[in-house]
């Protein structure tokens, strides 16, 4: 057994950690579809799913079975290869982006010094998946939806990145673990970077194409947008991917602005995973509450809001942060 070296054991443990974390993320994304329907029913004074199992608890299993057995149909005039690759690229980009999010002091898939840059690289890759889906479907509604989605994502990613430059200026690092530890030694960034938090949260909702920024999938205008031609497991990958995106943005908000796995004032540090999960769940509920309470604006209003309101606010935050950093030196 001389081939079993400490390096090999370390590699195997790292791979197992990555598999466990990514499986938890996928399961959470799938469960969110049921949780959202139940919460929307509660807030809108109706029952929600309540037919399969007690209190509708087995509805998710029924939906998964239905998805598995639906016909995996491809439009006759579609580009079959690109049409198939689009949901795979979308799901892969989301899971790879989650790799740089530290869950606890010891649990995380990858501890990269360029963690923030890696996240934005994967977020940019997801834009290609949306364009692939719309163009390869050979459907005008799908193409319009993909063009809307790509323009919206690229626009909001601009100040999404700028919103985090204030954090980078204060910590001097793109590493997410360094950012979390900096907050433990000083204060959570929600206080000194409040403007950055607001713009990052707005951009996160827009990048995940969630209500009220779901114009790329507007049923009344585009009949579900770029996944109109998808069915079966391909559609399921887009569907679950949307909820994984919610988990990802919520986890990033916790990591970058709310101390990551640390509790308030350093309370009960041994419950690091519980603190991280509770804070992430709060932002997930906030995503669902936005869907239940806000109307959908016009697409031109969404784009004007990004460039005329959010971008100047982000630049103001960056200017103020730079002034404080220079004054502190």
UniProtKB/Swiss-Prot annotation:
Compartments it resides in: Cell inner membrane
GO process annotations (BP): aerobic respiration
A GO cellular-component term linked to this record: plasma membrane
Membrane topology field: Multi-pass membrane protein
Coiled-coil ranges (or none): none
UniProt keyword list: Cell inner membrane, Cell membrane, Membrane, NAD, Quinone, Translocase, Transmembrane, Transmembrane helix, Ubiquinone
Catalytic reactions of this protein: a quinone + NADH + 5 H(+)(in) = a quinol + NAD(+) + 4 H(+)(out)
Pfam families in the record: NADHdh
The EC number(s) this enzyme carries: 7.1.1.-
Family matches, as PANTHER family: NADH DEHYDROGENASE SUBUNIT 1, NADH-UBIQUINONE OXIDOREDUCTASE CHAIN 1
Protein name, UniProt field: NADH-quinone oxidoreductase subunit H
């Amino acid at each position: 057994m001389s081939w079993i070296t400490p390096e090999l054991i370390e590699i195997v443990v790292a791979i197992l950690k990555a598999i466990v974390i990514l499986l938890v993320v996928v399961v959470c994304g799938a469960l969110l579809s049921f949780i959202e329907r139940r919460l929307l029913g509660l807030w809108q004074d109706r029952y929600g799913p309540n037919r399969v199992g007690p209190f509708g608890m087995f509805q998710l299993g029924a939906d998964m079975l239905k998805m598995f057995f639906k016909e995996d149909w491809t439009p006759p005039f579609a580009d079959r290869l690109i049409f198939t690759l689009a949901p795979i690229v979308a799901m892969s980009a989301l899971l790879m982006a989650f790799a740089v999010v530290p869950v606890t002091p010891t649990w995380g898939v990858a501890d990269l010094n360029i963690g923030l840059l890696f996240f934005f690289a994967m977020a940019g890759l997801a834009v290609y998946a949306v364009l692939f889906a719309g163009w390869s479907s050979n459907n005008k509604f799908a193409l319009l939806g993909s063009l809307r989605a790509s323009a919206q994502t690229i626009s909001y990613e601009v100040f999404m990145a700028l919103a985090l430059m204030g954090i980078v200026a204060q910590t001097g690092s793109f590493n997410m673990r360094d950012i979390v530890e900096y907050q433990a030694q000083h204060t959570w960034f929600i206080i000194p970077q409040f403007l950055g938090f607001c713009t990052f949260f707005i951009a996160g909702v827009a990048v995940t194409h969630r209500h009220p920024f779901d114009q790329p999938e507007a049923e009344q205008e585009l009949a579900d947008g770029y996944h109109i031609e998808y069915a079966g497991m391909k559609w399921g990958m887009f569907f679950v991917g949307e909820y994984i995106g919610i988990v990802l943005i919520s986890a990033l908000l916790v990591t970058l602005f709310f101390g990551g796995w640390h509790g308030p004032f350093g309370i009960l540090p041994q419950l690091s995973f519980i603190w991280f999960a509770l804070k992430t769940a709060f932002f997930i509920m906030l995503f669902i509450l936005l869907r239940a309470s806000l109307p959908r604006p016009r697409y031109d209003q969404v784009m004007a809001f990004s460039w005329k309101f959010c971008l100047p606010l982000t630049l103001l935050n960056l200017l103020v942060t730079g002034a404080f950093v220079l004054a502190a030196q």
